Amino acid sequence: MTKRNLSLLFSSALILLGLGAYLFSAQTAVAQASPLYAQCQGCHQPTGAGVPGVFPPLAGHVPEILEAKGGREFLIQTLLYGLQGQITVKGTKYQGVMPAYAQLKDEEIAGLLNHISTQWGNKFPAGQKAFTAEEVKAQRAKTMTAAQVLEARNKLGLK
């Protein structure tokens, strides 16, 4: 084998290793978020469809939230501090309480938000990237009540 062929073989192997590591890390992040979603699916269902009039859907609604100014922050705040009060999603009213999940690590909350943002046909709006632990940490530095999170949601202009 010539030096050139050996060099090409070595370069190809490095590229494949790098690609494999990237794909593995992406799959690992989704796999780690999926067990966390088990805590959510009792209300929001495995399909993200929720229960009409009782628990709001995540499928089709999370992208609407992400498109609103302040939507990313609101989603993080909802997981950290919970949500209490009446909301309307796609014309259906919901009156209830979503518990806070502040006990989760910043990385877990980011992973869970990335999971619900990319499942059931949901996609990040153009130009938005995946949630990061740093974003969660910034929102964790604030102290909010579930009622204040509701106020933040009301400012998003969602229907």
PLM regions and their residue ranges:
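Electrostatic cytochrome c docking/interface patches
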Residues: 18-37, 50, 63-67
